[in-house]
Amino acid sequence: MKYANRPLSLLVAGALVVTLAGCSSSAVSTLTASSAAGTVLSATESEFSLEGATAFTFTDSGISAAEGDYNGYTIEGTALTISAAGTYVVSGSCADGSITIKADTKNVTLVLNGLELTSTTTAPIVCGKSTGVTIAVQSGTQNTLADTAANNKDSENASADAESSVLKCKDGAQVVLCGSGTLNISAAGKNGIKSGTENEGREAS
């Protein structure tokens, strides 16, 4: 998949399949974009390491965590909140769960390693204000993020926690998408990927 170096609209309704390449196994390199609002970048040179990563497995009844070097997180039922830098690997299947990167948290790498995650009330993944996050799709894996019609602020049946997108990047968030696996995004609410500003595309193949 290739993105030209031009503004790229990711405010997508319906189904979206994202296949990106370019993550290699070493330390995370930084891509930045200066904007008051959230920015999503697809990149060819963002790198990550699984060494010392903290791993989570989602199920319909909860989230289990395997020991790793990074403990900046909290779990409440099927909701995972990350509040400190580190590498976090997520897998499993959950019909109503979520992942939130807490506002102002930088240098987070979130590795999708065979994750099927649906949220019935909000965005399955929320990158809070002024966060710095690399979302890496692990090679050889199929991953699916989905929401429901209740995740639409414009709907009369909207959830109180609605974000109107499956992947929400709030103001000031810098989010890099990369990886050679497959990410399927199914938006029943409104948008597939939404940030607070026009998204910038970088070539990814």
Which residues make up each language-model segment?
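A composition-driven surface/loop motif
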Residues: K2-S205
